[in-house]
Amino acid sequence: MREHFNDGVEFARFLAHRFVTDKAPNSAAALTYTTLFAVVPMMTVMFSMLSLIPAFHGMGESIQTFIFRNFVPSAGEAVETYLKSFTTQARHLTWVGVVFLAVTAFTMLVTIEKAFNEIWRVRQPRRGVGRFLLYWAILSLGPLLLGAGFAVTTYITSLSLLHGPDALPGAETLLGLMPLAFSVAAFTLLYSAVPNARVPVRHALMGGVFTAVLFEAAKTLFGLYVSLFPGYQLIYGAFATVPIFLLWIYLSWMIVLFGAVLVCNLSSSRLWRRRSLPKLIVLLGVLRVFHQRQQLGQSLRLTHLHRAGWLLPEDEWEELLDFLEKEQFVCRAGGGEWVLCRDLGAYSLHRLLNRCPWPMPSRERMPASLDEAWYPPFQQAMERLQVEQEALFGESLAHWLADGTSGAKVT
C-alpha cells in the first residue's frame, strides 16, 4: 500500500514537472487572451448551427444559460448578460463581419491545437484540408451534439413534471449528473481528437473524468473564494466582474492543459519509474538499435525501441531524434518510422562526443552493468579518460592561476 502511495506521489511530481516543462502556464495565458476574443464568435457559430435544425430552434439561449449556470462560478452572471447582448448584435453582422467571426473562432482552435501538440511533442502539426475538416467538425458537430444532449435533458425534466417524480426512476440524480457527464464527454473528445497523435480512447476517457471532477471542485472553491473574500469589489468597483472572469478562464485552461499532460503520460506511466540513464549512453543504445535494423533493411519506431529494451518516454525519444536528424544520422521514412541514413563506419565516437549536446557522464552516473555488448569497453574507455583528465587537470585553481605558471600570458 505504501509503495503504491509513493508511486502515486512520484507520478504526480513527474506530471507537475512535465506541466512546467511543456510551458502549459504560458499556453493557458495565450488561450485566455484568445478566449476573450473568440467567446462571442463561438457562441454565434453555435446558435447558427442550431438554427439550421428546426427541432433546435430557440435552444441556443437555453444552452447558454445552462453553460453559465453549471460551468462558470456565480461571479459570471454579469458577464453572461453582456455576452448575450454581444451575441445578439453579432447575428446582424454583414458577411464581412461573419467571416471575421469565423476566423476568430478558428484562431482559438489553432491555439488549442498548438498547446496540445506542445504537450504531445508533436513534430508535424496538421496542415491544409485535415486541419480545416477537424475545426469544421468541432464548430459544426459540437453544437449539434450539445443541442441533442440538451434536448434529452429537457425531455427527462418534462417527463418528471408531467407524470410525477416516479415516471422515470433516478431522474433527479440523472439530471444532477448531466453537467458532469457533459464535461466528461467534452474533455474526452478534446483529448482524443485535437492532438495530432494517436491517443487511446481509454486514456482520453480517464483524462476526461479526471479533468471534469477537478473542474467541478475548482468551480466550487472559486465560488467560495469570491463570496468569502470580496475585497476585489472594493478595488475594481463596477468592473470587478471582468478580472474575476479572466482569472476563472485562466484557471479553467490550466485545468484543461493539466488533464492533457495526464492523458499524454498515461501511456508512458511505466516508463517514468525507470532509473534514468545518462543521455549519451541512451544515444549510443538508440544508435545501436538503428544500426542493427539497418543491417536487416528495416525502419525503426519507438515501439521497436521498447522491444529492444530501451524504454524511452516519448519526449526523450523526440529529443534524441531532433539531434540525430540535425546531424543527418536518421531520415523520416513515413508513418512515424525512421531509418539510419549514415554510414556509422565513417563516423568516429570522438566526433560524436564533440557534437553531442549532452555531457559525458561521470563515473558515479555510469551504470555498473548494461545488457549491451558495446558497453563494457565503452565503460573502460570512459574510466581511462577520466583518470587522464584528473591527472592533467587535478591541480587547484590557485596553482593554475598563480603568477609564474607555465603558459603564455595574454596582453
Swiss-Prot record:
Main subcellular location of this protein, as a coarse class: membrane
Superkingdom as given in the UniProt entry: Bacteria
This protein's record includes keyword Membrane: yes
Membrane topology, as annotated: Multi-pass membrane protein
KW Cell inner membrane (keyword) present: yes
Family classification: Belongs to the UPF0761 family.
Name of the protein: UPF0761 membrane protein PLES_43641
Source organism of this protein record: Pseudomonas aeruginosa (strain LESB58)
Phylogenetic lineage: Bacteria, Pseudomonadati, Pseudomonadota, Gammaproteobacteria, Pseudomonadales
